[in-house]
Amino acid sequence: MPKPALQILPDALLAAYLEQVPSGLQEAFDALQEAEISTPDFSFYTSVASVFSSKIEGEEIDLDSYIKHKKFGIAFLPDYTQKIDDLYSAYIFAQTNPLNQQNIAEAHKRLSRHLIPQQYQGRLRTHNMYVSTPDGRIEYVAASPYIVAQEMDKLYNDISYLLKKEMRIEEVFFYASLLHLVFVKIHPWNDGNGRSARLLEKWFLAQKLGEKAWLAQSEKMYYQQHAGYYNNIRMLGLEYPELVSDRKRIFYFQCRSSKPTNLIIADVIIRD
């Protein structure tokens, strides 16, 4: 019996999602433009993505300081800029390489250079993992290390299938958010999972829609709404098996939360 085209990403409520997408998405996307401050050697919007994705993870850096560092070469203490530089490098790599299993691992190697020891960079974890809140509560438990490889194989299958599939721009946003969500719930790396998930979402958008996707300030919006971002993830249940056994949780996450995560980036583009 042949395997289903999609092995891990549910799409049963795609139609319900499409009813909520704001109008004018394609026109707004087409109108995105690079910032005047950008040069061949410096990307303003890649800096925005790197700074705010890092701030979600607790890095203490502001955009103005990072631009001074990245564009004008102003020196800061290494601890202030190293991890953001690493993530910037991963974004630049993604912008010039196809989205596939090998390159996802390479992007993680780049963004995790100052997060984890070299032997764990770009390699799937082999131990239990959970995400905790600042007050010590368990936010959610990631996939068991015994199934991480098989779950990621399913995700890579779905990425490959979706990259070949013709779809409307609204559908692209739907699947991009699902990739982000399922990746972060699997939590395949020892560290750098959130950064990787946000990069993966935008990488998929760019592969399907073109390089203008890199100009969307989705990471900034996720940071500005990070409480809702984590509240939505919390709706999916504490344990990873709850995610895969009750797909209605994903649909609730997508279609009924006060600010569905897969509409945030669409809102960003239209409002910009």
Model-predicted segments: where are they?
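FIC/Doc superfamily catalytic core
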Residues: 1-272
